[in-house]
Structure formats: structure tokens, C-alpha cells
């Protein structure tokens, strides 16, 4: 169903959507905002049941698909959509979605843990990479960024609608009966020396300080050129795809 929405940037509905940029308000209402066609397209294709409402300027293939899926679509002027969104260019569409339920995967083979990862761009990119590598779940522990932070959501490019993720305690993750690995530049063993065919939890830490002292196996990513190291998102991509290739033989 398509209807006409608010025409004033000062309307209560616009203000309520804009407040989703605030973490406390998001948690209170259990809602978050998806901005741009890619994220909204993935929500419509994979989790239409969590979409409360799509706001759109003009016509789009995404809004047509949403209407076919029974999702509420509301037409708004461009200035109203801009007032709702954090980004300067939301590309004419945004969606209010309910928080996603998390179901613990059965017999997981590849799990990603982000501990104290503060940068939303890194968190979103790693979640997207985990999705691409076929990981079973992503856990955010410690003081990691809120997964419903707007920049995290945008950085996932819709992958948060594909892969289960949740916030939990690190101890719960460490209790998993899987091989647990963490990267370290001073580790005694390199990535290629590890049996990655085993079901594995990859643990990635804070961008500046790494991980706390943990009783898990440390693995070094070999540097063949002159770079000092890889950034967090790049290191995660190397590790996750190494596991994905090994597990798929």
C-alpha cells in the first residue's frame, strides 16, 4: 500500500524517525533506520516482515517490490526525507525497521566475534565480509559499537538482513566448543599453519589496543611486502576467507 506522508520537516513523524539516530531512543522503541536503496532492497527481499514503513521520494523499483510484499510505502517530499536521515544523500529512500531477532545457529562452522570494536565503519564492513564468506553468526562483545548505529547499518550494505548477529558477553563466546583463533603480529604460528577446516571462531579486537589477554590461540597474518600491518577490516577479510576456502575444500 502506498500513501502520502508528512509534508513538513517539523511534523512529529519526521521527528520520531530522526530520533532513531539516538541509541537510547532506538533501544527504547526497538527500531532502527535503513537509508538508501541497497539496504532497503535487501530488507524487502530477505526480511520484509521487520519493516514498519518505507519512505520514498518519487518512484523506485524498491518501493514497487515493497508494495508487492505488502510493506507500507509512504511518499514524502525530498526535504522531509533529508530531515529524517543522517546522510546528506539518502538516494530517495529510507525504511524504519524493527530490531532483528537472533537465533543461535545449529552446528556453526564459522563464527565472527568483534570485541571492543568501536569504529562503526569497521564493524559494518566486517559484518558484510562475514556474510560474503558464509559465516554463521556475528557476535559483538565488550564495548563494541551498537550494530544499529546508522553508519554500521550503511556499511553492511544490507548484509545485516542476511546473517544473524547479536550483542553478548565475551565469556559466552569463549565457552563455545569450537576452535577459537585471534590475530596477533607476534604470534608464533602463521595463518597457513593452522587447520582451518575445523569449525572456527575468529576473534577480532579493538582497532587501537587489540584484544585483552585471553587463553586462545594467536595467529599471525604474514606480510610479504613492506606494510607494517593490515587494518582491522582487511585482516578480518583475510582470515574469514582463509577459513571459508579451507572449509569448502
Where in the sequence are the language-model features?
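Amphipathic alpha-helical repeat scaffolds
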Residues: 36, 118-125, 229-235
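Short, polar loop motifs at secondary-structure junctions
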Residues: 37, 57-62, 99, 170, ...
